[in-house]
Amino acid sequence: MTPRVLDTNIVLDLWVFDDPASAPLRSALQEGAAHWLATSPMREELARVLDYPHIARRLNARALTAETVLGHFDRHAQLQPDAPRAPYVCKDADDQKFIDLAVQHGAALHSKDAQVLCMKNRLARCGVALNPPLPL
């Protein structure tokens, strides 16, 4: 089973926005059929984003709390030490930690961020598949 790194927007799609396109990944995580790698800074970013007013409104509308979403993170993500800098640098510094971890572990990277998507070929040279279908 190929490990996967999920950026914050993907995590929001999974457990805040309940995006139908994320249903296969959510099911795979819940069934233990997908191996999600993350770091403490990724969890910290998620906690910070969950406090944004537009995200908090969405949580309230769905009768969710930030703690519930962070609980999904804690239950399904396997924490890893921070990864060393990958050979390719993202223009969006906030996304670099996801790239670094994916490169270090040869993990699939799930992201919708344009600055990450434009790196698809470079990441492939490092053994990172960008947004691969399930299963992998």
Please provide the spans of the model-predicted regions.
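Short, flexible loop segments at the rims of nucleotide/cofactor-binding pockets, characterized by
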Residues: L12-W15, L59, P84-K91
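PIN-domain endoribonuclease scaffold, especially VapC-family toxins
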Residues: S27-R85
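Residues at secondary-structure transition points
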Residues: P20, L37, L64, V89, ...
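Short, well-structured N-terminal submotif of metal-dependent ribonuclease cores
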Residues: M1-A38
